[in-house]
């Protein structure tokens, strides 16, 4: 059985498929100060938090913003959840010790558990949860598989990317397991819109590239907002309502239908930025980039 080994010193009471992780070796997690003034977003000098050869990816902040949960693949190819405090010089600590692997750790709305995409012994990928205080995992969605990515909208509702041809986006009531398909041909980015009952995702449009789209839960409607910059796959919101994305070494901010450059981190040796996470206070940006 899988167990968690939660580090009490953290003082804590936010997916990718296995194939995706294996294909993206050689990544580190970086942290940079972030400041939002009106519509402007400023990104400071980044610090490499994980700084090792191998796969360190899928960061998400804890509710207090003091630490990150993330996925790391060890020397034996096993993917597990790790944690690291955001203070400079902090040492990563292992949280799970699994037989095959878990991905995309995200603290759940109840603040008592974190959810993961767990690869089971028969290679099935489903949504599970672990207690933050340590203990055995529990299956969250029994019938829905294979799950690749997920984001929580509230304590009873989760938005999941279900692998397939095409991949589909589904809103699921975890109390009943009832799933409502809302889109297909989607990318890997799933983020909740702050202060709104809505979720952003990437819509892949043939011959037109990747578009940022939004699903309004109350209206049950999808609208396209605009194309992503070339090479961008992920987005993140600040608590103050600024939407950012990244491509190459650059961070961009959404500004009235146009992506405006917020920072060029090439001078810091940052290459191929992918996943993004912003702290609950909006003062830090965590991102994934290639190993230096």
Language model regions located:
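Bacterial N-terminal signal peptides
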Residues: 7-15
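Sequence signature of WD/YWTD-type beta-propeller architectures
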Residues: 19-292
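Bacterial N-terminal signal peptides that target proteins for export
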Residues: 1-7
């Amino acid at each position: 059985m899988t167990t968690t080994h939660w580090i009490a010193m953290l003082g804590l009471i936010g997916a990718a498929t296995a194939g995706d992780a294996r294909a993206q070796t050689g990544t580190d997690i970086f942290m940079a100060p972030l400041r939002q003034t009106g519509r402007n977003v400023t990104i400071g000098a980044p610090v490499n938090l994980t700084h090792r050869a191998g796969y360190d990816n899928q960061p998400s902040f804890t509710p207090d913003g003091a630490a990150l949960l993330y996925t790391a693949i060890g020397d034996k190819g096993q993917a597990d959840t790790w944690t690291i405090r955001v203070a400079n010089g902090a040492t990563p600590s292992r949280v799970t010790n699994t037989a095959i692997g878990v991905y995309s750790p995200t603290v759940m709305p109840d603040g008592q558990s974190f959810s993961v995409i767990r690869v089971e012994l028969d290679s099935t990928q489903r949504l599970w949860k672990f207690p933050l205080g340590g203990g055995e995992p529990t299956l969250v969605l029994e019938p829905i598989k294979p799950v690749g990515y997920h984001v929580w909208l509230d304590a009873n509702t989760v938005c999941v990317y279900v692998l397939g041809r095409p991949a589909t986006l589904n809103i699921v009531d975890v109390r009943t397991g009832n799933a409502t398909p809302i889109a297909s041909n989607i990318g890997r980015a799933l983020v909740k819109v702050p202060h709104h009952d809505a979720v952003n995702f990437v819509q892949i449009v043939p011959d037109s590239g990747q578009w940022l789209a939004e699903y309004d839960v109350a209206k049950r409607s999808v609208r396209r907002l605009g194309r992503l910059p070339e090479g961008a796959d992920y987005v993140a919101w600040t608590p103050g309502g600024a939407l950012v994305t990244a491509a190459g070494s650059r961070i961009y901010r959404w500004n009235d239908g146009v992506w405006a450059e917020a920072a060029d981190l090439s001078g810091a040796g940052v290459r191929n930025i992918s996943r993004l996470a912003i702290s609950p206070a909006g003062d830090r940006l965590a991102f994934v980039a290639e190993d230096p």
